[in-house]
Amino acid sequence: MKKGTKVIVQRDETKYPARGTWRWFRGKKGVVVTGLIGGDEYGVSFSKGDSADAYFKAYELTERK
């Protein structure tokens, strides 16, 4: 995914069960603001800023139109 890609935070919860803070982010819409961090995570902003509000693995994000 590239910077500026619009995404929805969702994942297969049968394969990756929800725990911790995951419930806070489930179904939220945001924009990718940073590329791969540490080799496998993307920074996502839920506001209009350029700073990442949270970081997610690729399997937790789905591109939206």
Swiss-Prot record:
Domain of life according to the entry: Viruses
Protein name: Gene 51 protein
Species of origin: Mycobacterium phage D29 (Mycobacteriophage D29)
Taxon lineage: Viruses, Duplodnaviria, Heunggongvirae, Uroviricota, Caudoviricetes
Gene: 51
